[in-house]
Design a protein with these regions (language model features):
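ATP-dependent small-molecule kinase phosphotransfer cores
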Residues: 41-98
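RNA pseudouridine synthases
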Residues: 99, 106-112
C-alpha cells in the first residue's frame, strides 16, 4: 500500500528536521514542521515560540505535579490544550494532502491510519554534539548536556501523551543512524524503502 503520510521523529541534533524537509522536497509534498507551528499559532492564539518550546518539550515535570499547574483553557493545562489542538490540526492536514510531518508525536496521533510510514532518526551523542554547534552555535551549556536535556524532555513529553517509550524501535517502521548514512543518504534510503512498499 502506498504511504501518503511520512512522520519523522528524531533525536536532537540528528538532522531529522533537515531529512524531513529534503524528503518532502524530493516527494513533491509539504513538510509540516515550522509551518505546523504557524498554523497552531493562528488556531490557538498562542505565541509561535511558546508552541515550538512546549509542543515537544512539555511537560518537564513528573506527571503528578504537572496535573496541577498551568490551568487556563476549559479546565485543561495550556500544554494539554495545545496537545488537543495539535492532534486535531495534524489529523485535519493529512485528510487534505500527502505530507511529511516532523515531530509533534505525529506517529502516535496517526497510529490508526494504514497510509502512514513512521521513521526515527538517531545518531551517537558525539556526532549530534558536533552538529548542534554547527547548526545552532555555541552556548554557555555544553553540547552534550544540551542534547541530553532536549532528548529527556522529548521523551517525557512523548511518554506523558502517548504512554509509549520515545525512540523505541517497535514504534516505528524504520530507524536510521544519520551518522552512518549522512543526510542525503538517509533521504535516498527512505525513498528506496517507500518505492519497495508501493510495489507490494
Amino acid at each position: 500500500m502506498k504511504k501518503r503520510i511520512i512522520t519523522i521523529s528524531r533525536e536532537f541534533g540528528s538532522g531529522g528536521r533537515t531529512i524531513g524537509r529534503q524528503l518532502a522536497e524530493r516527494l513533491g509534498v509539504h513538510c509540516y514542521d515550522k509551518e505546523l507551528i504557524e498554523k497552531l499559532a493562528e488556531q490557538t492564539g498562542l505565541a509561535q515560540k511558546y508552541i515550538e518550546e512546549q509542543g515537544e518539550y512539555a511537560p518537564s515535570m513528573n506527571r503528578f505535579s504537572y496535573a496541577f499547574v498551568g490551568r487556563g483553557v476549559n479546565g485543561l493545562s495550556v500544554s494539554d490544550y495545545l496537545w488537543n489542538e495539535q492532534r486535531k490540526k495534524i489529523q485535519e492536514l493529512v485528510e487534505k494532502e500527502p505530507c511529511v510531518i516532523v515531530g509533534r508525536c505525529a506517529d502516535y496521533i496517526l497510529r490508526e491510519r494504514k497510509d502512514v510510514f513512521n521513521i526515527f532518526i538517531h545518531a551517537p551523542q558525539s556526532e549530534r554534539a558536533k552538529r548542534i554547534v554547527e547548526v545552532y552555535g555555541e552556548t554557555d551549556t555544553e553540547p552534550i548536556k544540551r542534547l541530553r536535556e532536549k532528548d529527556k524532555k522529548r521523551a517525557i513529553n512523548y511518554k506523558y501523551y502517548t504512554e509509549r517509550e520515545w525512540g523505541r524501535a517497535d514504534n516505528y517502521h524504520l530507524t536510521l543512524d544519520s551518522s552512518v548514512f549522512g543526510i542525503e543518504g538517509c533521504v535516498n534510503l527512505i525513498l528506496r524503502v517507500l518505492d519497495e512498499i508501493k510495489e507490494k
